[in-house]
Regions:
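Hydrophobic (often cysteine-bearing) scaffold residues that line and stabilize catalytic clefts
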Residues: 1, 5, 55, 59, ...
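Residue-level preference for non-acidic, small/hydrophobic
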Residues: 9, 24, 30, 60, ...
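A short, well-structured edge-of-sheet supersecondary motif
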Residues: 9-47, 79, 112-120, 295, ...
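Short active-site loop at a secondary-structure junction
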Residues: 15-23, 43-101, 137-149, 245-248, ...
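Short, Gly/Ser/Thr-enriched beta-strand-loop segments that form substrate-interacting elements
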Residues: 38, 286-323
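Short, surface-exposed loop or secondary-structure junction motifs
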Residues: 94-304
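Glycine-rich phosphate/pyrophosphate-binding beta-alpha loops
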Residues: 243-251, 309-321, 334-340
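Short, gly/Ser/Thr-rich active-site loops of penicillin-recognizing serine hydrolases
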Residues: 266, 276-283, 340-364
Length: 364
C-alpha cells in the first residue's frame, strides 16, 4: 500500500474535472507515506505534503467526535445521556441522547443558513437561539438525516462541559495531546490551499431552496467573491460562528490527520486517550447501514480480508479513514471546488482507495 500512494494521488488528480491539487497519505505498521500533486490555488502554487486544507465536515470527526470520545473516556459524559442535560432549551425531543445526534437521527434539519435569522426587531439573531427556534423536520430517532445542525449542537455541548470555547477545548482534548501542531480552526496563514472561489454554491442553495427549503427570507449578505484561502469555506461557520463550529472550520495537514487516525486505529495502544469500551461504542454501526457515532463505515479489503473502515468525507474534497485494530489510516486532501465542474468527494475517496488496493469489489 505504501508504494501505491503516489499512484493514488495521481489517479484522483487526473480524473476528468479532477481537483486542482491532491494529497494522499497512508500510515501502516510498515510506515507512513504522503504524496502531493497539483496546485494549491488558481495561480499554480504547488501543493506540498505539509499544505493545510479546509477539511469541511471532516471537522465533525477530527474535532467534535474525537472531543466527545475523549470526554466519555474521561468519564465526563455518557454517550446515552440526553443532550438537554448539557445544552438545555434545544428543539430535540425530550431525552434525545448524545448518541442519537451523533448518528444523525435526532430529526433536525440537515442545514439552514442561520446567519439569515433575525430577531423581531430585525437584528441578526444569535445563531444558537436561531437553532433552538427551528422546528424538527423529521420524527425523532426515526431515520438518519445527515445534519450539520446536530453537530453544531454537539460542538456547543463540548463547550458547556469543558467551560472553554470550542477551539480551545479541541486543542486541550485532542490536538495538543496528539501533537497535531498544524490542525485547528482558522483563520490560518502560510502554506494553505484555496478551497473555492467565492460563495457561489451557498448563494445558489439559498436562491433555489435546493437541496433544502430555506426557512428564512433572503437578506443582505456580504458574499465573498474572492479565492478562499485560510478562511473557512462553510457559510454558517464563517458568518454565524466566526470560523469555529462543531460541524466545520478545521484546517489540517495530511500528516496530522494520519497521526490522529492511526492513534484511533490502534486505540488499544493509547488507552490513556481512548477508553476501550468507549472506542467500541464510537465505532459500532447503529440502526442505519454505514453510520457509526459521528464516523461513517464502509467495507474495505485489507490483506485479503474484508474489514470495516470508519471514515468521514468533507465537502471541500477531503476525507480521513481508519481500520480499527489494525493501525491502518488513510487520508485524502483536495481542493475539488476549484474545478469548474467539481466531482463528488465520495468519487475522489473511492478512486484513492481503489488505487491503494483497499477497495472492496463486493461493495460495488
Amino acid at each position: 500500500m505504501l508504494d501505491a500512494v503516489g499512484a493514488a494521488a495521481r489517479a484522483v488528480h487526473t480524473l476528468a474535472s479532477g481537483p486542482l491539487g491532491v494529497v494522499v497519505g497512508i500510515s501502516t505498521d510498515a510506515g507512513t507515506r504522503i504524496e502531493a500533486v497539483g496546485a494549491a490555488d488558481a495561480a499554480g502554487r504547488p501543493v506540498l505534503h505539509g499544505t493545510r486544507f479546509d477539511v469541511a465536515s471532516v471537522s465533525k470527526v477530527v474535532a467534535t467526535t474525537t472531543s466527545i470520545h475523549r470526554l466519555a473516556s474521561l468519564g465526563l459524559l455518557r454517550l446515552d445521556e440526553p443532550i438537554d442535560r448539557f445544552v438545555p432549551g434545544t428543539r430535540c425531543a425530550p431525552g434525545t441522547a448524545i448518541s442519537t445526534l451523533m448518528r444523525h437521527r435526532a430529526g433536525l434539519w440537515e442545514w439552514q443558513p442561520l446567519y439569515l435569522a433575525r430577531t423581531p426587531d430585525g437584528d441578526r439573531a444569535d445563531p444558537y437561539d436561531a437553532l433552538a427556534a427551528l422546528p424538527l423536520r423529521y420524527p425523532p430517532d426515526d431515520h438518519r438525516a445527515y445534519s450539520d445542525l446536530g453537530f453544531i449542537l454537539l460542538g456547543r455541548m463540548v463547550e458547556k462541559i469543558t467551560g472553554l470555547p470550542l477551539d480551545r477545548a479541541v486543542a486541550q482534548l485532542v490536538t495538543v495531546p496528539l501533537g497535531l501542531d498544524a490542525t485547528g480552526y482558522g483563520p490560518v496563514t502560510g502554506d494553505v490551499a484555496a478551497s473555492a472561489v467565492g460563495d457561489g454554491i451557498e448563494q445558489e442553495m439559498i436562491r433555489t431552496g435546493v437541496p433544502y427549503p430555506v426557512l428564512y427570507p433572503a437578506g443582505d449578505v456580504a458574499w465573498r467573491p474572492y479565492e478562499l484561502v485560510g478562511e473557512v469555506n462553510d457559510g454558517n461557520c464563517h458568518r454565524a460562528f466566526a470560523g469555529v463550529s462543531g460541524h466545520a472550520g478545521v484546517f489540517a495537514t495530511a500528516g496530522d490527520l494520519l497521526r490522529l487516525a492511526r492513534s484511533l486505529a490502534a486505540a488499544d495502544d493509547h488507552e490513556d486517550l481512548w477508553r476501550p469500551d468507549v472506542t467500541s461504542r464510537i465505532f459500532a454501526e447503529g440502526p442505519d447501514a454505514g453510520q457509526a457515532l459521528g464516523w461513517r463505515t464502509m467495507p474495505v479489503q485489507l490483506d485479503g480480508q474484508r474489514r470495516t473502515m470508519v471514515w468521514h468525507p468533507g465537502f471541500t474534497g477531503c476525507g480521513v479513514g481508519l481500520v480499527p485494530g489494525t493501525g491502518v489510516a488513510v487520508t485524502l486532501l483536495s481542493n475539488r471546488l476549484m474545478s469548474p465542474e467539481p466531482l463528488p468527494t465520495a468519487l475522489l475517496w473511492a478512486t484513492a482507495l481503489e488505487a491503494l488496493g483497499l477497495a472492496d469489489e463486493a461493495a460495488h
